[in-house]
Regions:
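Topology signature of small-to-medium multi-pass alpha-helical membrane proteins
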Residues: 2-152
Length: 152
């Protein structure tokens, strides 16, 4: 793989993680700003919102707000990761893939496979993070192969 190809892949990975991060930051803020039933209905968009009751116990609101906080910091982390990936950081390439990827594994297993969400935006964001991870691996290992070839 040429250096130009590696750079292009890293730029694409950056754009994917920044989009993913901004969407999750917005979701985090909206989750915290709303009461639990509205927050849950916002995420579980394939479920009839009428099934969510008007109020939940304050502990349920706190739990949902914790989830919103996690979405917010994870989104911020991946946006920052995108900045450092743009600059060629292999460390941030790895950690951004781990943080964003593990987050979406849970979403995929419990929400997508559970049938609680529509394809857009949730499943699309899982595809975005999966694509970023695959392209990260191609850029990293393709670039490593190029370095090995240059030495020999």
């Amino acid at each position: 793989m040429t250096p130009a190809n590696t750079t292009l892949l890293l730029r694409i990975v950056t754009v994917l993680w920044v989009i993913w991060g901004l969407v999750h930051m917005l979701a985090g803020v909206l989750t915290i700003a709303q009461v639990a039933p509205a927050s849950i209905a916002g995420v579980a968009d394939a479920v009839d919102p009428a099934v969510f009751h008007e109020t939940y116990h304050a502990a349920a609101d706190a739990l949902i707000n914790q989830h919103g906080f996690n979405l917010l910091w994870i989104g911020l982390f991946t946006v920052l990761g995108g900045v450092f990936i743009w600059r060629g950081s292999a460390t941030w390439l790895f950690f951004t893939a781990v943080v964003g990827g593990v987050t979406d594994v849970g979403y995929f297993v419990f929400m997508d496979l559970g049938g609680y969400v529509n394809f857009f935006p949730g499943t699309v964001m899982t595809i975005v993070s999966g694509s970023a991870i695959v392209l990260s691996a191609v850029a990293h290992f393709g670039g490593a192969q190029q370095q090995r070839d240059a030495v020999t």
